[in-house]
């Protein structure tokens, strides 16, 4: 594991701990979050996914905030919940939830097909089995 990967994972776990979210990410999950961050910022250069792109801000405002659902649903890590993320945008909170809680069954929907295509590519890399992505217009 490179020093950059280690630092990213440490910063992410620190943000989760500071929010008192009862989750300890595995090294593999931390690597997946970093890979998603890299894909997000690269894709954001050609497709408007998010205005938040600085690493520490993404860790706090996208990743840790998404995982904070655990505070409202304390047994989130103990049951195979089904979650529908309508208007997912760049995949928040759905993608971070899927990485942190692989047993969740997620459906992500967004009105822009190009965002759904980005999310589907990410799903194929990591947690495709329990995540479905659909274009949706309300």
Predicted regions and their residues:
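A generic "alpha-helical surface" signal
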Residues: 31, 57-60, 110
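N-terminal auxiliary segments of SAM/dcSAM-dependent transferases
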Residues: 1-54
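Conserved SAM/SAH cofactor-binding pocket of Class I
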Residues: 67-138
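SAM-dependent Rossmann-like transferase core, predominantly class I methyltransferases
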Residues: 49-77
């Amino acid at each position: 594991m490179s020093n950059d990967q280690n630092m990213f994972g440490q910063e992410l776990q620190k943000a989760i701990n500071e929010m008192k979210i009862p989750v300890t990410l595995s090294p593999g999950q931390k690597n997946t979050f970093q890979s998603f961050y890299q894909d997000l910022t690269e894709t954001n250069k050609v497709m408007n996914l998010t205005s938040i792109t600085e690493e520490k801000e993404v860790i706090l405002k996208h990743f840790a905030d998404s995982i904070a659902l655990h505070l409202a649903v304390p047994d989130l890590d103990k049951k195979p919940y089904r979650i529908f993320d309508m208007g997912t945008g760049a995949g928040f909170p759905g993608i971070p939830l899927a990485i942190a809680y692989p047993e969740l069954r997620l459906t992500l929907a967004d009105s822009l097909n190009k965002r759904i295509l980005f999310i589907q590519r990410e799903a194929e890399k990591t947690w495709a089995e329990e995540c479905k992505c659909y274009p949706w217009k309300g």
